[in-house]
């Protein structure tokens, strides 16, 4: 079993959920619902893993809120 952290945003133009796995080339997708996005990400990641385990370019560390005056 493989586990990856996905970053998810909502596109204001299309109202779709858009997700990507940081540092995993090609691991991105979209969906009308979070469940659809999750299924789509699982599908694309499984397909990419068919080429072998990726060497991730980056490591997800976390998020921060930045306040600017």
Model regions and ranges:
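Short, charged, surface-exposed hinge/linker loops at domain edges
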Residues: 1-7, 35-69
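Short aromatic-glycine-(Arg/Gly/Cys) micro-motifs in beta-strand/loop hairpins
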Residues: 9-21
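Short acidic, gly/pro-rich beta-turn/loop elements at beta-sheet edges
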Residues: 16-18, 29, 39
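Generic low-complexity segments that are intrinsically disordered, proline-rich and/or Lys/Arg-biased
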Residues: 23-26, 55
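A short, exposed loop/beta-hairpin motif centered on an aromatic-Gly-Thr core
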Residues: 25-34
């Amino acid at each position: 079993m493989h586990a990856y952290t996905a970053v998810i945003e909502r596109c204001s133009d299309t109202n779709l959920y858009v997700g990507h796995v940081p540092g995993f080339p090609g691991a991105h997708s979209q969906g009308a619902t979070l469940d659809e996005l999750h299924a789509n990400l699982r599908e694309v990641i499984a397909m990419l893993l068919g080429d072998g385990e990726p060497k991730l370019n980056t490591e997800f560390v976390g998020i921060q809120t930045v306040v600017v005056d």
